[in-house]
Design a protein with these regions (language model features):
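Generic signal for short, ordered secondary-structure residues
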Residues: 5, 9, 70, 88, ...
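Surface-exposed beta-loop-beta
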Residues: 67-78
Length: 159
């Protein structure tokens, strides 16, 4: 038996997808799972669905978060300023977008949030630090107590 799901989130109830659309999406996703087959191991270009990309991005965020860094529990420790992706990848944080779910003028410590690059041209530009982690690492807070705010991945002309 195959199964899948779909959902909608928004700041305002009127912006939510209607129930018929949600049901149709869930049904279509479930049907696409039928007759799946295994492929032999090979190197191929991959396109991730948005839901999968969010999960992968979550792993990156955890690896560059202050807690993992000051505990020496990150594979990206001491990688600031170094390439971690191909040069066409940019990941930036935009905390002040109107109506966006992650928008916030301040982090959970009251520090002002600001737009900035996390990765630019494949190079790690910024860690994700609250005040405590920043002090432990001898750096400045990035206004990310409580997490990140509206991360965007841009791969230039590869989009």
């Amino acid at each position: 038996m195959e199964r899948d799901y779909w959902y909608s989130v928004a700041r305002r109830a009127g912006q939510l997808d209607d129930l018929e659309f949600i049901g149709t999406q869930a049904a279509q996703r479930t049907l696409r799972r039928l007759d799946a087959r295994h492929l032999q191991t090979r190197r191929l270009p991959v396109i991730f669905q948005a839901e999968v990309a969010r999960g992968l991005l979550g792993h990156l965020v955890r690896a560059i978060s202050g807690g993992a860094l000051y505990r020496n529990a990150s594979f990206l420790l001491d990688r600031l300023g170094q390439p971690i992706f191909p040069d066409w990848v940019r990941i930036d944080e935009r905390p002040h977008l109107k109506q966006a779910l992650g928008s916030a003028p301040f982090d959970s410590e009251g520090v002002a949030t600001c737009a900035h690059d996390v990765v630019n041209a494949g190079v790690l530009q910024s860690y994700i630090l609250d005040s405590y982690a920043a002090r432990r690492l001898g750096q400045q807070t990035t206004g990310n107590a409580g997490g990140v705010h509206n991360l965007f991945i841009n791969s230039g002309d590869k989009d």
